[in-house]
């Protein structure tokens, strides 16, 4: 039995969820990659009843035991009420909500407060400073790749985040914005900062980003100037430059000053 074709808004009810949970594999609701099951795929549904959401989180231990499911895919949801966010917060593991175009401060707080796992909300294109300040209460990665710009308030909030942050939608970052984002550079070691949408850096911006205490992802940069390479060589953890197409001898010398294994890709290829 395959997934039905989407013709109208589909609300996931308790009755439908019970059928899915009985054998999600038969109903093609398991998301897998290279034969490894990693998520319960409910992307078909654009809404979920509160009763169904409660049943879902209560069933997680059985799903994990039987199917090793830890990730919940709800990318069809277009709205997130505070009540639903409170329930989904109880899901231990990753949650994908990439269909959301916006999120209220209350819902952001309810979803993220002490939540144990990554949260994907890549569909959001605008985020208030208040919402940003609540999202940082999550205890796993935050994926916000739909954001093209960030307010100073949001940047300041994210500087306090102790976990991984993905902002791959940003295509520009001024040195002042980088200062705001990295200002708490002595905070506990975070997982990483993804800025793969940046294709070039000014020297002042590179100097600021190098102060970030965690792994720094800059895979959108294809050509690294010598002075930028020198600045980034001072980065404090692993530096990801997987988009590099060429590297001058001088730039390579600068990057080789970092400890072995802290630059990706391996510089022997340049």
Indicate residue ranges for each PLM-predicted region.
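Aromatic-residue detector
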Residues: 10-13, 20, 180, 254, ...
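The leucine-rich repeat
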Residues: 16, 49-52, 81-84, 104-107, ...
């Amino acid at each position: 039995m395959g997934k039905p074709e989407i013709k109208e808004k589909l609300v996931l009810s308790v009755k439908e969820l019970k059928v899915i949970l009985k054998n999600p594999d038969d109903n093609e609701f398991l998301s897998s990659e290279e034969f490894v099951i990693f998520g319960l795929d409910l992307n078909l549904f654009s809404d979920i009843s509160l009763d169904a959401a409660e049943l879902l989180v209560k069933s997680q231990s059985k799903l994990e035991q039987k199917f090793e499911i830890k990730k919940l895919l709800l990318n069809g949801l277009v709205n997130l009420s505070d009540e639903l966010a409170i329930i989904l917060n109880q899901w231990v593991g990753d949650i994908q909500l990439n269909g959301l175009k916006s999120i209220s401060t209350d819902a952001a707080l309810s979803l993220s407060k002490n939540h144990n796992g990554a949260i994907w909300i890549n569909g959001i294109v605008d985020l208030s400073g208040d919402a940003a300040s609540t999202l940082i209460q999550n205890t796993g990665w935050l994926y916000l790749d739909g954001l093209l710009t960030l307010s100073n308030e949001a940047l300041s909030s994210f500087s306090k985040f102790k976990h991984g942050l993905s902002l791959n939608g940003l295509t520009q970052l001024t040195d002042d914005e980088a200062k705001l984002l990295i200002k708490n550079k002595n905070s506990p070691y975070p997982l990483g900062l993804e800025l793969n949408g940046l294709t070039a850096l000014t020297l002042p911006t590179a100097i600021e980003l190098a102060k970030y205490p965690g792994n720094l992802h800059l895979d959108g940069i294809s050509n690294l100037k010598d002075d930028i390479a020198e600045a980034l060589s001072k980065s404090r953890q692993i530096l990801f430059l997987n988009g590099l197409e060429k590297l001058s001898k001088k730039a390579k010398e600068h990057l080789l000053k970092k400890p072995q294994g802290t630059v990706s890709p391996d510089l022997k290829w340049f």
